[in-house]
Curated annotation (Swiss-Prot):
Organism: Bacillus subtilis (strain 168)
GO cellular component: plasma membrane
Family to which the UniProt record says this protein belongs: Belongs to the RsiV family.
Subunit and interaction comment: Interacts (via N-terminal region) with SigV.
Side Cytoplasmic, residues: 1-37
Record topological domains on the Extracellular side: 59-285
Gene name in the database record: rsiV
This protein's name: Anti-sigma-V factor RsiV
């Protein structure tokens, strides 16, 4: 992978998640079920959070000048809009759509998720400004959008895609999955009784990789010690989502477990493999 893309990958992964989020999730686990409707839309809370980004722009003259050229949606003048950041500079471009979540009764959780989305967009825009400053040359393209992959009466899973291109391309997918009835942001470890899921899921993914390569010679996964970065195990907080039919899907970024041409890779984990490890059948069946 291109060294610059590797740096962008690490910096994006290091975007700090609000400290309050873990506490909020724990609180939400104890809340009584409530009925509500959740939609994706820029919220007043998210708009208020734009102050954070405005401060960043005011500190950086190049950023301020660039932001003044961004198409504005709504009544926010010369400031970031949470729908889209779009700019072209020389032969580089950025197009970042920032999602905002609304409809949760737990506003602390809702605001923390939106703050996380905002920080991610800040980091992407910061990288764009730094990489396209006057003393630097090169073509950079950053594109980010989002989509709802699961929307049932109980669950909402949202995928945010980030594609960075500079000589070569690198694609990431990030998910959040929410229990809409109970206002809970689900984490991978929260679905299981203990840490045994890490080993069990990792082993199943390896078996799926081997089977796929056996059936299709064009597919390659990094599994052997001869590979530069062989896949050993998933992370405790590995990227995941839950499908509409309540199946667990584990996701890997481009280059994470396979060559770039394989793109973002996903593995659906058979429920029978993990059923005895689950805390219950509410989410995974």
């Amino acid at each position: 992978m291109d060294k610059r893309l590797q740096q962008l990958r690490e910096e994006y992964k290091n975007v700090q998640i609000p400290k309050e989020l873990d506490i909020i999730v724990e609180k939400a686990l104890q809340q009584e079920p409530k009925k509500k409707r959740i939609v994706m839309w820029p919220t007043s809370a998210a708009i208020a959070a734009a102050i954070l980004f405005t401060a960043l722009v005011n500190i950086n003259p190049d950023a301020a000048q660039a932001m003044s050229k961004i198409p504005v949606i709504g009544k926010i003048v010369k400031a970031i809009t949470f729908i889209e950041i779009k700019e072209e500079k020389d032969q580089s471009s950025i197009d970042v759509k920032t999602p905002a979540l609304s409809g949760l009764s737990n506003k602390e959780l809702e605001n923390s998720i939106n703050e996380k989305y905002l920080k991610e967009s800040q980091q992407l825009y910061k990288e764009f400004i730094q990489s396209t400053s006057k003393n630097k040359k090169g073509h950079l393209s950053i594109y980010s959008d989002y989509e709802t992959v699961t929307d049932t009466p109980d669950l909402l899973s949202i995928r945010r895609n980030i594609e960075t291109t500079q000589a070569s391309s690198y694609t990431q997918s990030r998910y959040i999955t929410i229990d809409k009835k109970n206002d809970i942001l689900l984490t991978l470890k929260s679905l299981f009784k203990d840490e045994r899921y890490i080993k069990v899921i990792s082993q199943n993914i390896k078996e799926q990789m081997k089977q796929q390569m056996k059936e299709d010679p064009n597919k390659i996964y990094w599994l052997t010690d001869e590979d530069a970065e062989p896949f050993k195990t998933i992370l405790p907080d590995q990227t995941f989502y839950i499908t509409e039919d309540h199946k667990l899907v584990i996701s890997f970024d481009e280059y994470e477990v396979a060559p770039g041409y394989m793109g973002v890779t996903e593995f659906t984990i058979p429920t029978g493999v993990i059923s005895n490890l689950l805390v219950g059948e509410r989410y995974i069946r």
